[in-house]
Amino acid sequence: MNEDVVLVSGLWMPAALMAPLGARLARAGFRPRRFAYSGRRSLAGATERLAAFTRGGAPHFVGHSLGGVLIFDMLSRHPGAGAGRIVLIGAPVTGCLAGRRLGAWAVGRWMLGTSAPRWQPCAARWERPEPLGVIAGTRTLGLGRMLGVLPGENDGVVQVEETTVQGMAERVLLRQGHSMLPLSGRVAALVERFLRAGRFA
């Protein structure tokens, strides 16, 4: 098979955090490639660098948190970019209440960097032909708990409803906290299955 898979980690999280998932995918015959970016710098610039990083190919994409948002934004803005199958893990593509609460403080705005505007509410529609799968956590463990109770099901940082993409192929909910999602063996198995078949079940 030897298909490329681009892995993109979340805000404040090193690209190495995706290493266990990458190792699982490598054992399954994929070629993982980690894309690194700085959340303190321009997100638009990171989106363009991701497009350049994958230009000329049609890799699969897997992103956690802000990494998933970057993937979604890049592929939405570059309809001609090649892609295989896409999995977003705990990615708040329609905005993030916890992020907005954090941004209400000066230190929070500094921590969020240029990502702050992306956490405002917005719609997310998938209009490309490639299948897009979403994995969301429902175990309320994470930074968001320090910023007040999050309504509805959430992973401690991202609400399940914030991961909603109109046109997504499928979404699964797992009893995991936000930071543990990319390290979960269950998540890795689901990602592998979706990259092979375009579905989780």
Q: What name fits each language-model region?
A:
Residues 129-201:
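C-terminal catalytic-base region of ester-bond hydrolases, centering on the histidine
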Residues 1-3:
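A short, charged/proline- and glycine-enriched loop
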Residues 5-11, 16, 20, 24-26, ...:
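Serine-dependent carboxylesterase/thioesterase catalytic core
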